[in-house]
């Protein structure tokens, strides 16, 4: 997963489940920023799926 990747929120425990966004910043190996329609949030890569 790298900056600019198109991702979908796949964690069903997340309020943003199913939303599609773009990785905007990688903080470290454990967290990334993703811009989704609801805003820009920090996610764990395990809760995201690269789709493009």
Residue spans for each PLM region:
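Basic/aromatic-rich interaction segments and small domains that mediate binding to polyanionic partners
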Residues: 2-52
């Amino acid at each position: 997963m790298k900056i600019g990747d198109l991702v979908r929120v796949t964690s069903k425990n997340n309020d943003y489940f199913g939303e599609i966004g773009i990785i905007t910043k990688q903080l470290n190996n454990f967290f990334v920023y993703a811009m989704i329609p609801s805003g820009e949030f920090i996610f764990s890569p395990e809760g995201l799926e690269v789709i493009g």
